[in-house]
Amino acid sequence: FITVRDFFKKKFSNLSQNIAHFGFSLLILSILFNNIFSSEIITNLKIGETFVSDKFKISFKDINQKDEQNYKAIIGKFEVIDSKGSNLIMSPELRIYNQPNIVTSEADIKTNLLTDKFMTMNFVQNQEYFNIRYQIKPFMVWIWISVILICFGGLISLFKKKYEN
């Protein structure tokens, strides 16, 4: 179809193609908007400190330790307040595995229909500070929805051809 009018005029004759092409255009727009509107803050904080920017405030509230079967978890508690006053508690963790001795960062991810918010933390060597990375990634869910639409259009086309034969 060339215009929106053609899309509605032809109705279901090319339904699979329309769904897949709509999914692809949604994918391109989602990636574009994600790239334009993403933001990231990388800073070093210790317990009790606060990082302030014009868009949000990140407060490092507390650290808890938790012993699991094959690793020890260090869980940070952060409060993120955006410019609108929305309050968000994030809890990224560091995992220290026993055999072999490996340290990994586990992100805390908060997702809604428009944005994903990620936070990770790492040790800063020989200091009481932790390296904090906070990212806001808009339209991540829409990237996945567009991929599902592309696959759905392909499946409809596949089964439609099978049914016609």
Question: What kind of region is each of these model predictions?
Answer:
Residues F1-N165:
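Solvent-exposed, non-transmembrane regions of integral membrane proteins
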